[in-house]
């Protein structure tokens, strides 16, 4: 009997996060200073993503997601603002932001469970991006909740490997 595709609801546990979009000078050591600041204060970084900002090699945008209970927003912003290479800080409230993550998973090619696997992948809005002789790689670019749901749905299949990026976010336009 093949595993059934997971069609359940996303668990909506009220986890509160602060999403900070931090514009920094693109210089060596800046990320280490930011991470060090969080470590010294005992703030846990839930998610972290860094990339060059808006095609300017001089700046990078750091998206940091922290647990609201462990890290008071005002204190984080004040401490970040003291760092020399920090140019700007935006607090993106989850309701006012568009958030995305990337999930990549390698699954064994199991022809017996192939239909259920394809149904699960398709229903999640994911796609197969690579096929090898014994495994496939699945990708989903979606909300953190969609990535959580796909990760849970793939639990019925043996995973060779699973990776998720840090969250990225932009303010909503309207």
Tell what function each PLM region has:
Residues 1-60, 65-174:
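Long, contiguous binding/interaction regions
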């Amino acid at each position: 009997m093949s595993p059934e595709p997971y069609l359940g609801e996303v668990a909506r546990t009220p986890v509160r996060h602060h999403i900070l979009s931090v514009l920094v000078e693109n210089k060596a050591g800046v990320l280490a200073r930011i991470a060090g600041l969080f470590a010294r204060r005992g703030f846990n970084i839930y998610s972290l993503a860094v990339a060059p900002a808006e095609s300017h090699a001089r700046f990078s945008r750091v998206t940091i997601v922290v647990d609201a209970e462990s890290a008071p927003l005002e204190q984080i912003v004040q401490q970040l603002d003291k760092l020399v290479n920090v140019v700007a800080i935006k607090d993106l409230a989850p309701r006012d932001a568009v958030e995305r993550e990337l999930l990549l998973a390698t699954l064994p090619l199991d022809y017996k469970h192939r239909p259920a696997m394809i149904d699960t992948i398709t229903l999640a809005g994911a796609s197969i991006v690579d096929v090898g002789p014994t495994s496939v790689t699945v990708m989903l670019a979606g909300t953190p909740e969609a990535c959580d749901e796909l990760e849970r749905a793939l639990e019925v299949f043996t995973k060779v490997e699973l990776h998720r990026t840090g969250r990225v976010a932009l303010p909503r336009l309207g």
